[in-house]
């Protein structure tokens, strides 16, 4: 039986799940927990409610309905996305192979305004350790982050590179890192280099020489996961076509991560379209 894995349990993710499971496709939703909807005190502009509804209540009803129809929800954090013979979402609870994946984790967090971070993207700044570790064999690199997502990237790099430095950029550690990883808690003032990364400048002016910086801030949102497969991204928005498919076959995105109007109604529509089109594509084989 074909299966779809959806990353995110907000309006877009649950809507996609409803349409996919009703189309006869085995559907699993991976969720780290409540998102932006749960922080909404009241919603007054959503179809079908005579009185304002709170975000948590709307979320509860939606998930309850999806479970009733057979959608499986798994509480875990997605940390990677790969494709060998099929798409696979890597999580803290294990790997979830899928015939199609829908990314619906909401809008990406703002990337810190570190000079050189975006300018050297693809020239020493990377968003995917599994994709690019090979190019840094025997070299000194850094991972920018402090949590489980950063740990996942560190573990992919350690067998390949000479050394890994963890740059927390002032944030507290929220994961246990291997002892061979050098942890630097200072703020990063700049990523250095002209043609390619040569190092980082830390608060106070100290410079650490490096050949690459891997970005793994916070949790792996939809944009970060899309980048891991080379899907087109414009700023913090995942590029999709009129069927909500990214530039990678079988990979879809819906909701705030695609940009535009950041509203529940828009997220529900895009989720419905992504779930419908993904299921339709699987039926065609």
Question: Which sequence ranges carry the predicted segments?
Answer:
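A Rossmann-like FAD-binding core segment of flavoenzymes
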Residues: 66-84, 88-90, 96-98, 159-238, ...
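Hydrophobic/aromatic ligand-binding patch that stacks against planar heteroaromatic rings
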Residues: 15, 19-20, 101, 156, ...
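FAD-binding core/adjacent interface of flavoenzyme oxidoreductases
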Residues: 1-5, 73-138, 214-216, 238-246
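Short loop/helix-cap segments at secondary-structure boundaries that form the rim of catalytic
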Residues: 39-40, 113-118, 134-136, 173-180
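Hydrophobic structural packing positions in well-ordered secondary structure
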Residues: 66, 102, 125-128, 157, ...
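Beta1-alpha1 glycine-rich phosphate/pyrophosphate-binding loop at the start
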Residues: 4-60, 65, 139-173
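Active-site-proximal substrate-binding core of FAD-dependent oxidoreductases
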Residues: 39, 280-285
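FAD-site-proximal beta/loop scaffold in flavoenzymes
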Residues: 113, 119-135, 217-266, 273-276, ...
């Amino acid at each position: 039986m074909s299966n779809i894995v959806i990353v995110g349990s907000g309006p877009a993710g649950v809507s996609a799940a409803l349409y996919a499971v009703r189309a006869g496709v085995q559907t699993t939703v991976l969720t780290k927990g409540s998102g932006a909807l749960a922080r909404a005190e009241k919603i007054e502009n959503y179809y079908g409610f005579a009185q304002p509804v709170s975000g948590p209540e709307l979320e509860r009803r939606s998930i309850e309905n999806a479970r009733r129809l057979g959608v499986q929800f798994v509480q875990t954090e997605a940390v990677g996305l790969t494709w060998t013979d099929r798409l696979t979402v890597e999580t803290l609870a294990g790997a979830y192979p899928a015939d199609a994946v829908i990314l619906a984790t909401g809008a990406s967090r703002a990337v810190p305004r570190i000079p050189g971070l975006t300018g050297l993207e693809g020239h020493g700044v990377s968003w995917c350790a599994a994709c690019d570790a090979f190019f840094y064999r025997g070299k000194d690199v850094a991972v920018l982050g402090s949590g489980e997502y950063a740990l996942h990237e560190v573990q992919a790099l350690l067998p390949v590179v000479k050394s890994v430095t963890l740059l927390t950029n002032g944030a507290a550690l929220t994961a246990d890192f291997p002892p061979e990883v050098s942890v630097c808690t200072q703020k990063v003032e700049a990523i250095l280099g002209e043609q390619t990364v040569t190092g980082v400048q830390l608060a106070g002016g100290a410079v650490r020489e490096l050949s690459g910086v891997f970005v793994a801030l916070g949790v792996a949102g939809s944009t970060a996961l899309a980048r891991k497969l080379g899907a087109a991204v414009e700023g913090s928005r995942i590029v999709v076509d009129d069927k909500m498919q990214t530039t990678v076959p079988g990979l879809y995105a819906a909701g705030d991560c695609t940009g535009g109007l950041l509203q529940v109604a828009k997220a529900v529509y895009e989720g419905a379209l992504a779930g419908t089109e993904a299921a339709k594509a699987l039926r065609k084989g």
